[in-house]
């Protein structure tokens, strides 16, 4: 019991509890609760002061920037709005102005609006073929050619093919040009007679000359062929 009490009192109470356990724990708590708290609180205080100074500097600079750049910015925005409003007003005046509606100005003619026409070509010998071919331009006759054609029309209202070839060679024309001119001249003659400007001639009242002209053209153009009556008679004589 003595040994146990002495061991417990000497070792446990004096050495362990008061010497090792009690004092170092309080010292550690004091150190941990005193110095770090004071340092941390000091840091907080200094940071708060710095933050307040920085915030006041920012507010002052922002206040300075607002006063220095605010009126100019507002002025530029106002000028932009005024320019846009004046532009819209000018466009409306141009589109809905009464002067442009009542008295339009001279319109400009562009190249794509112009109509292109081919100039008339002068007829030459051998340039145009027979009648019925496409893209046949109107022939511009000379004064000499018209005079000779009028002379021939005065004597002969209808031409044979041989006479037409002769006149075309003499006037440097082709047969089709001479034929068309005579057809148009006969139509013009009939129109004047119907209107009462010219007396009715016996040659133009009948179409026998025109039919004879067509028959002469067909006989000259087609080759000679035996008649069907002669061919049948020859066939019967050969068989008999």
Curated annotation (Swiss-Prot):
Question: Which residue intervals are annotated with compositional bias (Basic and acidic residues) in the record?
Answer: 208-217
Q: Which GO terms describe its molecular function?
A: DNA-binding transcription factor activity, RNA polymerase II-specific; RNA polymerase II cis-regulatory region sequence-specific DNA binding
Query: Which keywords label this protein?
Result: Developmental protein, DNA-binding, Homeobox, Nucleus, Transcription, Transcription regulation
| Residues annotated as transmembrane | none
Q: Where is the composition biased (Low complexity)?
A: 218-233
The annotated region (Disordered) lies at: 186-240
Short name of one Pfam family for this protein?
Homeodomain
Tell me where in or outside the cell this protein is found.
Answer: Nucleus
UniProt motif (Antp-type hexapeptide) ranges: 109-114
Q: Name one GO cellular component term.
A: nucleus
Instruction: Provide the residue ranges listed under DNA-binding region in this record.
Output: 134-193
Please name the InterPro entries in this protein's record.
Answer: HD, HD_metazoa, Homeobox_CS, Homeodomain-like_sf, HXA1/B1/D1
List this protein's GO terms for biological process: regulation of transcription by RNA polymerase II
Report the superkingdom from the record. Answer: Eukaryota
Q: What does this protein do?
A: Sequence-specific transcription factor. Part of a developmental regulatory system that provides cells with specific positional identities on the anterior-posterior axis. Acts on the anterior body structures. Seems to act in the maintenance and/or generation of hindbrain segments.
Question: What family, per the record?
Answer: Belongs to the Antp homeobox family. Labial subfamily.
Protein name per Swiss-Prot or TrEMBL: Homeobox protein Hox-A1
